[in-house]
């Protein structure tokens, strides 16, 4: 059974490792009935817990809001396709967490060039590996009219250094969160600094606010 993540309103992420209700030892109701719950942990997403990555309740004292604006509107999609002779790269800037993994490949991904993605400047194999390195799911690629965006791997939540939670392996994001157009459901990044304008997803704002694990 794969884990799930539930972003609680104005509160932490609840990582549910086992959604099967399990009896809690040494706990009962007032009539002596056994009490059970799912197995999970609360992960900080306000950015100010003194016990990161775990929630310590600080969100309630700092006035953390899980909304992005007064209307709590989802981010506007910015998906574009960059067509090459052998491979097409799809990119949604609105989903990007600005991890900068893609620009390590300066041949096909060059922020100083226009267009900044040119699939014909590198090999198909290299471009595929670059797309796979994108943690946010903003990048995907098509070959022969078939789009590829997901990978096969075990579910995992990784606490990146001074950055977001990196989700891989198809961990289900519960609730009404809106994924961007073309975004991967298998891998994505969740805001940990509390300042993203696209909550619950990371938009790179942790760089602007100088978020740290300490």
Task: Outline where the language-model segments fall.
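Ordered, small/hydrophobic-rich secondary-structure cores
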Residues: 1-42, 48-51, 57-62, 67, ...
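Short Fe-S-cluster ligation motifs
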Residues: 2-19, 73-101, 121-145, 154-176
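Short, structured motif recognition centered on aromatic/hydrophobic residues
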Residues: 13-15, 41-44, 53-55, 139, ...
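Ferredoxin-like iron-sulfur electron-transfer modules
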Residues: 32-45, 77-98, 108-129, 146-150, ...
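Short gly/acidic/polar-rich coil/turn motifs that serve as flexible hinges in modular proteins
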Residues: 47-49, 194-196
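Iron-sulfur cluster-binding cysteine motifs and their immediate structural context
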Residues: 52-63, 97-114, 131-145, 199-210
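Polybasic, low-complexity binding patches
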Residues: 67-70, 145-156, 214
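Terminal recognition/anchoring or ligand-binding modules at protein termini
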Residues: 195, 210-214
């Amino acid at each position: 059974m794969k884990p799930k993540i539930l972003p609680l309103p104005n509160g932490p992420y609840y990582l549910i490792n086992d959604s099967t209700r399990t009896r809690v030892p040494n706990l009962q109701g007032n009539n002596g009935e056994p009490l059970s719950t799912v197995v999970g942990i609360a992960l900080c997403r306000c950015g100010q817990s003194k016990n990161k990555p775990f929630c310590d309740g600080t969100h309630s004292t700092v006035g953390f809001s899980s909304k992005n604006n007064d209307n709590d509107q989802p981010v506007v999609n910015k998906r574009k396709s960059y067509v090459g002779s052998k491979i097409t790269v799809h990119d949604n800037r609105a989903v990007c967490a600005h991890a900068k993994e893609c620009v390590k490949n300066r041949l096909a991904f060059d922020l100083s060039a226009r267009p900044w993605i040119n699939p014909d400047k590198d090999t198909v194999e290299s471009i595929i590996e670059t797309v796979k390195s994108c943690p946010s799911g903003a990048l995907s690629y098509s070959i022969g009219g078939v789009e590829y965006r997901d990978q096969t791997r075990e579910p995992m939540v990784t606490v990146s250094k001074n950055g977001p939670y990196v989700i891989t392996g198809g961990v289900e994001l519960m609730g009404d969160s809106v994924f961007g157009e073309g975004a991967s459901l298998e891998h994505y990044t969740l805001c940990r600094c509390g300042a993203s304008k696209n909550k619950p997803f990371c938009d790179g704002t942790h760089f602007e606010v100088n978020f740290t694990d300490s």
